[in-house]
Structure formats: C-alpha cells, structure tokens
Amino acid sequence: MEFQISRTRRPYEFNMWKSHWHPYYELFYLVSGHCKIFINHSLYYLEPGDMVFIIPGEIHRTTYYSSPVNERITLSFDKEYLNDMTQSCGSHLTDSLFQSSKVSIPAGSRSYAEELIQKMVYEGAGQDGYSPMMMRNYLYELLIFLSRCQEARSDAGKMEIGEKAIEEAAEYIYHNYGAPLTLNEVAEMIHMSPAYFSRKFKSVTGFGFKEYLTNIRIREAAQLLINTGKSVTDIALECGFGDGNYFGDAFKKIKGVSPRDFRKMQGIR
C-alpha cells in the first residue's frame, strides 16, 4: 500500500463486526451523520466535519448512532508516503497531528477540506502519469490545513460519568494486559457490579471485555514475535496467556495464522 481513499455510506444499524488494527496510517473524516470511535483506550464522539487520526497498530472500533445514514471518507497510507513532507517540513507537523487523534474542522472551512479530498478521489482514478504526484501533494496540503485547524479540544464534556469510568477501565487494561485480569476485578476497581460493567463496557467501547483484552494481548504478542527472539511460550506468558494452547487458538482467530506461522511469514525463523 502507498495511498488509498474510499467514500462509504453506512446505515444506522451498521457496526464494525470486529475490532481491528493495521500497519498503516488512517484518516477518518465524517461527512454526515454521527458516530463514536474507540481508539486504544479513548472514546471520541464525531460530528460532521470531524477528522480522526489513527496511527499504525492502534486498535479501534466505530459505532454509528442517531442518524439513518452516515457517510465517511477514509484515507490510508504508509509511513513512507510522508517522507517528502517530513524532509521538507520536519516531523513535528505530522507528529502533533497524529498525537491529537481528533481535529474538528470549522463549518466555514469544511468545503476547502472536502474539495481537497474530492481532488484526491479524482486523481485516484488514475487520470494519467501525474496522478500519483498530485494525490501526494493534495494529501500534504490537507495535513497542513488540518494542523491549522488543530485545537486541544476534549470530548470529556460530552461523556457521562459512566463513560469516563469505562475509559479509565480500558486504560487500565491497556497498560496491564500482561496481568491475569478478570472482569470482576476491573469492575470492582471502578465501583460497578460485574453485570453492569460488562454491559456498559460493550455499549461505550463497542468491544466485549474479553474481546478487548484479547485483542490488546494479541497485538502486543504480534510485535514480540516480529521484534524479539523470545519463544512462543514466553511471549504467551508475557502477554497474559497462562495457557499456550489458548494463546495459539486466540492468535489464529484474530490473525488468521498460528503464532509460529506468523513469525515465519515475517521472514523470522
């Protein structure tokens, strides 16, 4: 992948059937409708004109609500696609953008952003040999424009007390995935009954408790398989899987291959 752009309309009833993460950058722009997106351990409410930045490896799930039809535009690209911009402007601009996770474009400026995106869609159809250069330049222009719109704007005011507590629980899981965590333990930590916590966690994040915990553990295990020479058994234990067979089954369910085969696919023996 170098660069991809897609425009999608989703009905209110649509929800991502599973969480996912990927090895490339993603810009998610909401054209119409309303949705919330849970990224790693943080919840964001999106309205038309909001742009979300997702960096490689971030676990996320989108849930739509209130509007019968929701329209979004997604731009995906790998790190190398930004090389020319980084060399010209330095990495500060892109680093600060992707650390912010969300930018709200003022209503009076949305047409500018959407025109740039539409130009990328046009060039993406492959007009001629200049199209790849034009798409790259339009993306760079969009990123500079977004950096000018950037504000430290929090969604905390939109969240209920219960939602804030769920964010706190998710952050705890995110940083303590290697421990033998249980639903009861985390529910007690934020002073909720296990049954209520289970329902609330699902409604806020889009994930079931076990699903979220397993996805975090598998993501970290995949990185250890690629970047270390540790044995599969040691990685399973380090990532909170007390049973090697369960680790293998969970890994294959999410990644489609066994841990050993995944490592071989990366060219690692």
Please provide the spans of the model-predicted regions.
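A hydrophobic/aromatic-rich effector-binding and dimerization subdomain
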Residues: 1-14, 56-125, 143-152
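Generic protein-terminus/edge-of-domain signal
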Residues: 1-51, 58, 65-66, 87-94, ...
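Terminal helix-turn-helix DNA-binding modules in bacterial transcription factors
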Residues: 171, 175, 180, 184-185, ...
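Conserved phosphate-binding and hydrolysis motifs of nucleotide-dependent enzymes
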Residues: 33, 41, 49, 206, ...
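Short, Lys/Arg-enriched, Trp-marked, Pro/Gly-tolerant hinge/linker segments that flank
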Residues: 98-109, 124-135, 144-175, 179, ...
